[in-house]
Design a protein with these regions (language model features):
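Bacterial N-terminal signal peptides
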Residues: 7-16
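Positively charged n-region of N-terminal signal peptides that target proteins for export
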Residues: 1-6
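Outer-membrane beta-barrel proteins and related beta-barrel translocases across Gram-negative bacteria
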Residues: 22-479
Length: 479
């Protein structure tokens, strides 16, 4: 047993040493145990252990650690850090003047300087809330008692034994609820109202709006935006008849959702639905189209155009404006997606193709990345936490390249890998063969990690056998 272990240790040292020698101490591989790469010119070092499972990497001032899929951490010299544990279970982010963490986004702590984007709030949703806003500090223990500022689209929310009592405030309007949602009183500057839902309710603000309902949602009457140049009147006996009128837009609905007509005088188009949302006809200059779902749909809305063929089989979304061109083709929602985008002002370009679960492809400003497989990335296309912690576990093949011909390829987490940069080329199929070419005059080929190794350079040629550091040398300086 000891002799076998000693032999394995000796072979491991020889194999790693031969690899390092071949690459000027910038590369050492022993698949799948470890993979070490470094570049002094790029200020870069990377170590991977057990394929994609463990990672330690430094890039300039930033250091990354990963124990996939359990743990990921990135930190820089200024103490800014980001940590994920079994994403999305736990996450932590630290800036110079703020700190936040979350557990499943239900337990969240976020405190620091508002200038850094911190909300200065903590909560265990939906039970406990604590924070500080411009109005002051707040705390709440739902449904017992508490006050919230700037939550759920309201300036203030207060409650006691909810739904027994609750109060909301928004833009000067206060609503006191008793046995929510059944009874409420509305108050504010020049504003009053009440409701006994769903029987009857009314509210009004002088010169701004008037609202009434009876047997909600059957009968309701509303006068809205009275203080603007586009006031709106709404009358309804739902679902039999609904009328909406304003100087810029009018609509009529009969037996909702079967028949409706919308006339938009501001944007100069007319739309008929019969029934909504299956059949729709739109006529106008910048707004026009025909929809007959699930067979066909082709609708243009100013700079946007949307088409369906055999919904939900094939969909095309397009946007063409002075600033951007964007097109997305989709098959069965997330099964296949192809996005093309160009920003005219900056010249930035993007191409992204996802074919779930087989592969993903992305090209950003001429730099391409292809990976196989793609299990969850199509559903969360810009999620960096998934990219860092989960994606490397199932990406059995990756390739990156640019328009200058530089290329990096990895198969089965570097069982086979290749790198090309300018005239320099290196590749390896572990443990059979390893090859490097720095120029037309310099090359290095090794079999079984150095059992047989042949080098050619400006100083001549050399053959090494059996992992030995000395060998047969001939050529220019052989004598």
């Amino acid at each position: 047993m000891k002799q076998g272990f000693s032999f394995l240790l000796m072979l491991t040292i020889l194999w790693s040493a031969s690899s390092a020698l071949a690459y000027d101490a910038t590369l050492s591989t022993l698949w799948p145990l470890w993979d070490y790469r470094a570049s002094d010119a790029a200020d870069y070092k990377s170590t991977h252990l057990l394929g994609p499972l463990l990672k330690y990497e430094t890039k300039g001032f930033e250091t990354e650690y990963a124990l996939r899929p359990l743990f990921y951490r990135a930190v820089d010299d200024e103490g800014v850090s980001e940590t994920d544990v079994l994403y999305p279970l736990f996450g932590h982010k630290k800036e110079q003047d703020s700190s936040s963490f979350h557990i499943l986004r239900l337990l969240t702590f976020d405190h620091g300087s508002p200038a850094s984007g911190s909300r200065n709030r903590s909560y265990l949703f939906p039970f406990f809330f604590y924070g500080e806003e411009e109005q002051g500090k707040y705390k709440a223990f739902f449904p017992i008692h508490g006050t919230l500022y700037n939550w759920f689209g309201r300036d203030r929310i207060s409650f006691t034994l909810f739904p027994l009592y609750g109060r909301t405030e928004r833009k000067g309007t206060r609503i006191d609820n008793v046995l929510w949602p059944f009874f409420a009183r509305i108050s504010g500057e020049n504003e009053s109202g009440f409701k006994a839902w769903p029987i009857y309710g009314q509210s009004q603000k002088e010169g701004v709006y008037r609202k009434k309902f009876f047997l909600w949602p059957v009968f309701f009457s509303e006068s809205l935006r009275l203080n603007t140049d586009n006031p709106q009147e709404v009358r309804a006996a739902w679902p039999f008849y609904i009328r909406k009128d304003s100087p810029k837009k009018s609509s009529r609905t009969i037996l909702w959702p079967f028949f409706s007509k919308v006339e938009n005088r501001e944007k100069e188009y007319v739309t008929w639905n019969a029934p909504w949302p299956l059949v729709r006809v739109t006529k106008g200059d910048k707004y026009h189209g025909l929809k007959i779902l699930p067979l066909f749909s082709d609708e243009t809305m100013d700079v946007k155009r949307e088409r369906w063929y055999l919904w939900p089989v094939y969909k095309i979304e397009e946007m063409n404006s002075e600033l951007i061109m964007r097109r997305r083709d989709r098959v069965l929602f997330f099964l296949y997606s192809d996005v093309r985008e160009v920003k005219y002002e900056t010249g930035d370009s993007l191409r992204r193709i996802d074919f779930w679960p087989f592969f993903g492809y992305k090209n950003v400003n001429g730099v391409s990345h292809l990976h196989v497989l793609s299990l969850v990335e199509p559903f969360f296309p810009n999620n960096q936490s998934i990219e860092r912690l989960w994606s490397p576990l199932w990406r059995v093949y990756q390739q990156k390249w640019d328009q200058q011909g530089n290329r990096v390829v990895s198969l089965l987490w570097n069982l086979y890998w290749s790198e090309k940069q300018g005239d320099r080329l290196a590749w390896e199929l572990f443990p059979v063969i390893q090859y490097r070419k720095d120029s037309q005059a310099e090359s290095d080929i090794s079999f079984l990690k150095g059992l047989v190794r042949y080098r050619k350079g400006l100083d001549g040629k050399q053959l090494n056998l059996f992992y030995l550091p000395w060998g047969i040398h001939w050529g220019r300086d052989a004598g």
